[in-house]
């Protein structure tokens, strides 16, 4: 059974269906649900700038969903020859494509194309991808395959977190035992980026919650799910900077993460880290 809607964008890729596969068709003329663009806060813009500083010219980008990935895209106006291989295509990419910042010419897999598995955004986005051969939407099982992801150069995967502990464990799907969201493709792209030549897996998050609680914590909440293990954590970014964790001891990691925590929480985190590790040297 097929629903035919002229307001639905026609996308290139492997989503085409042969008319002979359709038994029944229903015609509608409904508006497509939109995700409005929200103004970015100074905190989010700072996080985006810190992430952008880690992104090299010629990198292949994967961005998660939300304000922080959009803030990263805003900060990439002066980059060159970027490519995109991502789970989700969002409004923030349009300007980078129109200005040539994103052209995909250095990609090894699907060069000169933006590869994604789904898209959500405004009507402008849907109109942009409509019958646009530069945008290719492919099966998520292929797009998120680490063995495919790694083949592109300098894959830089930017994903979010709910909280990160002082050893680098990343919780991204729950608040304690309460599920908050799905894990999405975080594990796939963090791994794919880590084995890409010159790749950089990045976890980006605000230093505090809206209630002022630190999102960098000594221990994850009881029952919290670890989506990215500390063995796979490379870069953690907040509005206060970036901590490079890969190859460092747990003590060195704790010290680096405290340096990018909110200033109001650093002294307490230092005391808790010292209690746990006895030294931060």
Regions found by a protein language model. Name each.
Residues 1-281:
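Conserved phosphate- and dinucleotide-binding cores of soluble alpha/beta proteins
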């Amino acid at each position: 059974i097929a629903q035919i809607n002229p307001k639905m964008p026609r996308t290139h890729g492997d989503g085409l269906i042969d008319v002979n596969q359709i038994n029944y068709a229903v015609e509608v003329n409904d508006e497509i649900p939109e995700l409005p663009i929200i103004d970015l806060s100074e905190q989010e813009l700072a996080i985006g700038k810190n992430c952008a500083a880690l992104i090299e010219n010629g990198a292949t980008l994967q961005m998660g969903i939300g304000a922080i990935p959009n803030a990263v895209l805003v900060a990439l106006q002066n980059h060159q020859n970027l490519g995109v291989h991502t789970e989700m295509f969002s409004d923030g990419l349009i300007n980078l494509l129109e200005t040539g910042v994103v052209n995909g010419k250095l990609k090894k897999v699907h060069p000169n194309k933006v590869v994604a598995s789904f898209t959500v955004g405004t009507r402008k986005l849907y109109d942009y991808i409509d019958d646009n051969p530069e945008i290719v939407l492919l099966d998520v099982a292929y797009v998120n395959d680490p063995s495919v992801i790694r083949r592109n150069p300098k894959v830089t995967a930017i994903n979010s977190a709910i909280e990160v502990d002082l050893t680098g464990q990343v919780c991204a799907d729950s608040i304690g035992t309460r599920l908050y969201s799905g894990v999405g493709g975080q594990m796939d792209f963090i791994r794919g980026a880590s084995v890409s030549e010159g790749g950089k897996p990045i976890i980006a998050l605000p230093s505090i919650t809206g209630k002022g609680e630190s999102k960098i914590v000594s221990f994850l909440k009881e029952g919290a799910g670890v989506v990215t293990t500390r063995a796979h954590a490379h870069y953690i970014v907040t509005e206060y900077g970036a901590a490079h964790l890969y190859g460092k001891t747990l003590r060195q990691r704790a010290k680096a993460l405290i340096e990018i925590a909110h200033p109001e929480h650093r002294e307490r985190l230092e005391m808790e880290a010292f209690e746990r590790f006895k030294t931060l040297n």
